Design a protein with these regions (language model features):
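Short beta-strand segments
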Residues: 8-9, 22-24, 92-93, 99-103, ...
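PLP-dependent enzyme catalytic core of the Aspartate aminotransferase-like
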Residues: 119, 135-169
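Conserved glycine-rich beta-strand-loop-beta hairpin in the small C-terminal domain of fold type I
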Residues: 68-78, 90-103, 113-116
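Short, conserved charged micro-motifs
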Residues: 108-113, 150-154
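Residue-level recognition of strand-loop junctions within catalytic nucleotide-signaling folds
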Residues: 26-27, 55, 103-105, 145-147, ...
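AMP-binding (ANL) adenylation modules
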Residues: 129-134
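Conserved core segment of the aminotransferase class I/II
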Residues: 3-68
């Protein structure tokens, strides 16, 4: 629509090292963006390769494959959470993306959880890191994108133990 600028990146869909993005907007806006000529030194060869990859249908095939992998990982994490953690938290059921957000039950001490999880070898990001107003203390973000699908149940089992240790009930 008029006045809308849509931007994206190939960093998440193809490879994290690719610092190439794209923009869809009215011609006047894209012309102004092109005048900046600021590209962080991205190789013209890499840019051309991405253009060919996207233009000949390979990007769609790649995305189908990647989406199937992420869906399996997400489903594995959701199943493990349902089995092990429902007493201590609720969570999102994302349609896409890379993360599941947990909201801790009032009985769970977030600081104790961080300590217990660390001791059990579980890494997550506390939700407070995503809030500028001090909220989010009772939330955590779990990433399933990088995790090995076969290791997800074990990781969630450990998280469940940490939640149990951090629970006051």
């Amino acid at each position: 629509g008029k006045g809308v600028v849509f931007m994206g990146s190939f960093s998440k869909t193809m490879a994290t090292g690719l610092r190439i993005g794209w923009t869809m907007a009215e011609e006047q806006v894209t012309d102004a963006l092109l005048q900046t000529r600021f590209d962080l030194g991205v190789s013209p060869w890499v840019q051309r390769t991405i253009l060919e990859f996207a233009s000949n249908g390979m990007l769609e095939k790649h995305l189908e494959k990647v989406n199937a992998i992420y869906k399996r990982k997400r489903d594995a994490m959701l199943a493990a959470l349902d089995e092990r953690c429902s007493r201590y938290a609720t969570w999102t059921r994302p349609e896409g993306g890379y993360f599941i957000w947990l909201t801790l039950a009032e009985t769970v001490d977030a600081k104790k959880l961080a300590e217990a999880a660390r001791e059990l070898g579980v890494a997550y990001v506390g939700g407070y890191a995503f809030h500028i107003d001090g909220t989010g203390q009772n939330t955590i973000r779990l990433a399933y994108s990088f995790a090995n699908e076969d290791e997800i149940p074990e990781g969630i089992m450990r998280l469940g133990r940490a939640l149990e240790q951090a629970s006051q009930s």
